Structures are given as C-alpha cells and as structure tokens.
Regions:
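Conserved beta-strand signature within the Rossmann-like core of class I S-adenosyl-L-methionine
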Residues: 153-167
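A short SAM/SAH-binding and catalytic strip from SAM-dependent methyltransferases
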Residues: 130-145, 161
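A short acidic, Gly/Pro-enriched loop at the edge of an enzyme's catalytic core
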Residues: 124-129
Length: 212
C-alpha cells in the first residue's frame, strides 16, 4: 500500500528530495528498519496524513515564538540543499541568512541571503544576527553551541537522533551520550528539552536559556 502511494509522492516530490533521496526512500518503504526511520520516511508518512513536513512544523513553531520577540535578523546553520526552513521564515518577513556547504541554488527571495560555506565557531561572527536556529545540523551542532555560547547569542536547535563526532574527534556511543556531552559543553548556557512538532515523533531540542 505504501509503495503505491509513493508513486504519487515521487511524481509531485512535495519535499524537494534529490533523485538519490527518492531512491533511498523507495528502498526504505520496501524494506523498512523496525528500529530506525529516516527523516524522509517520516516526512512521507506525514504527507500521507495531510500533515506539514518536519521543516514546516519546525518553522511554524519558530515563527510563533519569534512573533513574541524583538528578533528580526535570523541565521540558520545547516539549511541543507534547498534551505526550506530559511525560505519559510524569510517569506514571513524576517531577514534570514542561511549557511551550508551543500546549498544548491540561490533563491529569489529579497530578504534571504545564502552563504555556501562551512560554519566554524572559531571564525564566524554572529554580531549581525539577533537569533540562531538550526534543524538537525549534524556535524555543525557543536559549532553552533560553542559559537553562541562564546558570543552570547540566543539559539534554538533540534538535534539529530544519532550521535555525531565531537570536535575532538571522539565518537559518542549513543545519542544520549551525545546530548549529555553537548549539555556539559554548554557550561549552563543551554538546556535540553523535548518537543512533539508532529503526532508521529518527538524531537530533542538544545536551546539557550535566553531567547525563547
């Protein structure tokens, strides 16, 4: 049943997946892993239910919070190929900059700036931005935390469900070890919470204690 629905999904490609991502999703639908689900599979299931994607739900949550703050200049770290999150927030009227090495194109949105570059906590100046957001930024996660802590910048970041290599080169044994390490690295600047952006999943959030 799912694979038949996938034919329609692939035709319209509502989440702007690459050819490889579509191919990988098709394989996962045919041979699902009972313990692990990809982000693309989750978005596919949400689409079947007529619900917003993970990025849309994250953006809607952030926009509701931003509306209660004075923040106008937003930096997204790790926007991915298509910078969907940044595009949504920019279209809502915020001045947004999105940085990632894999962004594939420029977008005709006046208040959206694309930086095709790597985010490094040692060199990136956050003084031009009011607030930093990131949705599962993978290897940039620790960079976001350290940059915001060092420059006293508020941030809101969802974490991947799997661990990533520390800047020291060590690999945490589990996602819980990874989350614990990040909290320790924050030196009290950040806190960890869990949010259900959709009815199918819960997401770990690392956020500054200031901001929202």
């Amino acid at each position: 049943m799912l694979i038949r629905n996938f034919s329609t999904y692939r035709q319209f490609n509502p989440h702007e997946l690459s050819k490889k991502q579509l191919s990988d999703l098709e394989k996962e639908i045919k041979h699902p892993d009972k313990d692990v689900m990809s982000d693309q599979f989750l978005d596919f299931l949400l689409w079947l239910k007529g619900l917003p994607s993970r990025q849309e739900s994250f953006a809607n949550f952030v926009l509701k919070k931003l509306a209660k703050t004075p923040y106008k200049k937003i930096l997204e770290v790790g926007g991915g190929r298509t910078a969907i999150l940044s595009r949504i927030i920019a279209k809502a009227g915020y001045e947004v900059t999105c940085i990632d090495t894999i962004i594939e194109e420029e977008f005709e949105i006046d208040n959206l700036t694309i930086l095709k570059d790597m985010f490094d906590h040692k060199t990136f100046d956050l003084s031009d931005y009011d607030f930093v957001i990131a949705q599962e930024p993978c290897d940039a996660t620790e960079h976001v935390l350290l940059a915001c802590k060092a420059q006293n910048k508020p941030f809101f970041m969802s974490l991947c469900g799997v661990p990533h290599k520390k800047l020291s080169g060590e690999m945490p044994e589990s996602y819980s070890d990874w989350y614990g390490y990040l909290l320790k690295e924050s030196d009290g600047y950040a806190k960890l919470t869990w949010i259900s952006f959709d009815p199918l999943s819960r997401t770990a959030i690392l956020k500054s204690k200031t901001g929202f």
